Design a protein with these regions (language model features):
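Flavin-dependent oxidoreductase catalytic cores
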Residues: 1-239
């Protein structure tokens, strides 16, 4: 590996102690879809892809998004990652990364009003510009179920050997739709004030932590600025 000048970032390649575990350095490979998720031998291919990144020096890898609920599965998509055989398949990925000296988190992604199927839900029935389907406004019971889905899904990730999960709360997907006033026009406990709009992601994180325990990484990904009218402001994000 060629020598890299890290003078501006002297701690970049130092270990990071998380209390219950440590990362070999502070290099994180952010979540991205690789195109390998839905092809034959996908788990073996993802294992090889991510293991090579770990061997190359990445301390913590975050996978592309996996969906925790039927309400966000596109038409024709594979079944949810909740069956024992799927847990076993994902262990192929985590084992390969661990053998290469890295750690890996799985991103949990609910696409909300971006989901390309007719039974999609959102905080408010506002159609996404990129989708022909109009979402149904989620009921209180549906909101509670989606929170539970995130928590349940995190257990399957833990069983598959992942070191943690990343909860996708940015870029216009379901969690971000609750946080932003532009897409959340509710007047109940899940909408209106910022404290109400942020309730959904906070409850998700709390429930996930309750299910997985303290010795499991939880990353929460949020948009720093939505850069659209009615999106989250800098002041809200700082809160």
């Amino acid at each position: 590996m060629p020598e890299i000048n890290i003078a501006p970032y002297p701690k970049l390649f130092e270990p990071l102690d998380l209390g219950f575990t440590s990362l070999k350095n502070r290099v994180l490979m952010g979540s991205m879809h690789t195109g390998l998720e839905d092809i034959p031998d996908s788990h073996e291919r993802m294992a090889a892809f991510y293991a090579e990144r770990a061997a190359g020096g990445v301390g913590l890898i975050v996978t592309g998004g996996f969906m925790p609920s039927e309400t966000c599965l596109p038409e024709g998509a594979k079944p949810l990652f909740k069956q024992p055989e799927q847990v076993k398949n994902h262990q192929i990925i985590t084992d390969a990364v661990h053998e290469a000296g890295g750690k890996i988190c799985l991103q949990i992604l609910h696409t909300g009003r971006y989901s390309r199927q007719q039974n999609l839900i959102a905080p408010s029935p506002i159609k996404a510009p990129i989708n022909r389907f109009v979402p149904t406004e989620a009921s209180g019971e549906q909101i509670e179920q989606e929170i539970k889905n995130f928590a349940d899904f995190s257990i399957f990730c833990q069983q598959a050997g992942y070191d943690g999960v990343e909860i996708m709360g940015s870029e216009g997907y379901l969690i971000n739709e609750f946080v932003a006033a532009r897409t959340n026009q509710r007047s109940d406990q899940w909408g209106g004030s910022y404290e109400n709009r942020i309730r959904f992601p906070i409850e998700i994180v709390k429930r996930v932590r309750e299910r997985v325990g303290e010795k499991f990484i939880i990353i929460f990904r949020l948009s720093m600025l939505d850069l659209v009218q009615g999106g989250s402001s800098y002041e809200e994000i700082v809160k």
